[in-house]
């Protein structure tokens, strides 16, 4: 047991309210209260996608009206300077910290989460994410980039990892009949967090800024308080089903027909199977392709279409005036917002669809359709057809999000539900890898093409074919996924012993609807869904307003 785990165990001993045994559901509990609890946490940590909203204000934190630049400053000097403004590129490393630490922390503490339950993990995630923002605010206030990286990037990144995986196995256990849909709803929140957080951050920055302050550190503190409240609500609303519980009238699907195992694979063995590494590669390649596009969505649209975006098809990007470039930058921001919306919607749509067509077939769809769309994108650009180009990338980003939301159910199908949260945590190292590979491939190919004199409207053609090759690799890996060999399955007595250990005080009902099938949503569940749904609806509305500039 690590020092972190020992301290957390001590905390639970003093405050048994966080113990796993305290959150076993009793008869009458409505399982539809669990997805909005997960959304409370995911909508908060999803702001990681929207952190770029802080870069421009922070790039003039000292200069105020314009950046106080120090061109000869090294990155090491930049970490400690108090007299020069930070470069946007240096602050952009926050994204790398976020997603590397997300994967690493999920892998390290996934097993601990399975032992202690989602409530304690959710509370620790809230403390890390909100606490990281507080430390980041201090870094902004004293103008120390290293402190901002440590707070928001490292400590916040640990909160991202624990918060991201905290609901996964719980939702899969509550919804064995709709695994994909349940995880799709929760993980959609991570994609939707920036839709709420970015416009909220803008509002707060404008409220707090003064002639002598850009208003960012105050915004960090305000958002830390808001996020801590919402995440604690989510953590304390988590409930676990009694061991062995299943919905009334539900019959587990046939293993032979569905590739859904009724057995369990232990956490210590899952990574020894070829299935784990094949699914790891499937996720990594799907995410590498999509995340590269997300990072370059705005400049890509501007450079490919140039004056076509504002009714001047004869003008390329370099021929535009400064004012015209400002206008098309606003249009491109709407494109990025639209991609974000499809990223979220795809998480619910594709994960829910996977319950009917199967996880393997869903990933076949991602790769085959993705290859077609990436290969067609240069043709759409050459045709000057903005609508087809935008539609293609909206579908691509829906499958990017769908890949995240479908993979927990894929793992549960392969390895069972007993350790799926911890196995998913280890698999998220694929995301950490993709977070480096995808942007590097897209950005460096763009720079190479630019240096070679390739016209801006053709800068991304070769990139699209490289991304196609990635998806072909993912398609092959998905094809190779077969059911896990019998030798890796736990013996029935081992499973029974673990379930008994997890249910010390649980003599509760093994079967029952827990409110589902006999009325569906009740008033408490409806109120809780509104609690998370109203902020999300506001974020969608703000995104649609920004996207309207495209048309």
Residue ranges of model-derived segments:
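Hydrophobic core of transmembrane alpha-helices in multi-pass small-molecule transporters
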Residues: 43, 132, 145-162, 284, ...
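Extracytoplasmic gate region of multi-pass secondary transporters
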Residues: 49-58, 268-350, 435-443, 447, ...
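Extracellular/periplasmic helix-loop-helix junction of adjacent transmembrane segments
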Residues: 54-104, 324-334
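Intracellular juxtamembrane helix-capping segments at the cytosolic ends
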Residues: 58, 161-175, 182-183, 402-415
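Central cavity-lining transmembrane alpha-helices of secondary-active solute carriers
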Residues: 93-111, 337-350
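C-terminal ends and interior cores of transmembrane alpha-helices
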Residues: 127-141, 368-382
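Glycine-rich segments within core transmembrane alpha-helices of 12-TM secondary carriers
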Residues: 176-199, 425-439
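Symmetry-related core transmembrane helices of the 12-TM Major Facilitator Superfamily/SLC fold
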Residues: 217-237, 461-480
